[in-house]
Amino acid sequence: MIGEHPYVKWAIRVIENYVRYGKVIEPDESVPEELFKRRAGAFVTLHKTDGSLRGCIGTYLPTKPNLALEIRDNAIAAATQDPRFPPVSPDELDDIVVHVDILSPPEPVRDISELDPKKYGVIVVKGWRRGLLLPDIEGVDTVEEQLRIAKLKAGIPEWDDDVEIYRFTVERYK
């Protein structure tokens, strides 16, 4: 697996242990100390070395006591529970690139002029439906396209503009 940043190395160790041995490992002294002190939403994204998506799962708000556990659980889910893909097999591990995104708290958007698909991710909400799109996604160059995809993910009709919109930033680690 490929990734240099310590947060990414933690995600890689988690995925390798889970995929190879079925073990959920606990964070230890090799995990950066700040991950034990911080809570935030986090996404773990897996790509093949050819750039194609292989898995992406995350949380936009913290659900665990600390970021080390948030990354751990989302790393396992990205490798094994993304409904778009079969679980990652041990044979694939050498050809997977891992990214970890740490999300800022979402803030309400009053006007779409406050959005920028390169800088901000979006969350669209209507009733119990919710769709999220991370920022700076290849091929997503306009606010309209970003909102269209987020609505699609939520199961909200593209033409329905009666939605709540939130934006967030990410710290992206590779």
Swiss-Prot record:
It holds the Pfam family AMMECR1. Residues 2-174 form the AMMECR1 domain. Signal peptide: none annotated. InterPro entries: AMMECR1, AMMECR1_dom_sf, AMMECR1_domain, AMMECR1_N, AmmeMemoSam_A, Uncharacterised_MJ0810. PANTHER family: AMME SYNDROME CANDIDATE GENE 1 PROTEIN, AMMECR1 HOMOLOG. NCBIfam families: AmmeMemoSam_A, TIGR00296 family protein. This is Protein TM_1551.
